[in-house]
Amino acid sequence: MKKKTGQLYEGAYVFSVTLSEDARRKALEKVTSGITNYGGEVLKIHDQGRKKLAYTIRGAREGYYYFIYFTVAPEAIAELWREYHLNEDLLRFMTLKASAVKEVLEFATLPE
């Protein structure tokens, strides 16, 4: 088995609901190709679908949520963030160090 190099991260990405399914797929591909372009490896992608945002972002009240587990050198994170800030289809993103890849994501339902 090949040893993975780099730090394990969990990335949360919220894309605009104005994107068509094809455009959303291309926007997600842009994020994942950015990871691999910096020598990283995408391990798992969780598509959480369309969800209501906690607050309005650039006029949007909903977004498409994706969680991506990936490995990459820590030095590459700043470059990835720079690319994310330039991506107009990406409403919000967050990158955290992870200890393990979660095969299933479970979220508690919040009261309305």
From Swiss-Prot:
Gene3D superfamilies: 3.30.70.60
Similarity remark: Belongs to the bacterial ribosomal protein bS6 family.
Functional note: Binds together with bS18 to 16S ribosomal RNA.
Highest taxon in the source lineage: Bacteria
GO process annotations (BP): translation
Organism this protein belongs to: Chlamydia trachomatis serovar D (strain ATCC VR-885 / DSM 19411 / UW-3/Cx)
GO cellular component: cytoplasm; ribonucleoprotein complex; ribosome
UniProt-recorded name of the protein: Small ribosomal subunit protein bS6
Gene name, Swiss-Prot/TrEMBL: rpsF
PANTHER family, A to Z: MITOCHONDRIAL 28S RIBOSOMAL PROTEIN S6, SMALL RIBOSOMAL SUBUNIT PROTEIN BS6M
InterPro entries with a match to the protein in the record: Ribosomal_bS6, Ribosomal_bS6_sf, Ribosomal_S6_plastid/chlpt, Transl_elong_EF1B/ribsomal_bS6
Stored HAMAP family: Ribosomal_bS6
Pfam families xrefs: Ribosomal_S6
Gene Ontology MF, one: structural constituent of ribosome
Keywords: Ribonucleoprotein, Ribosomal protein, RNA-binding, rRNA-binding
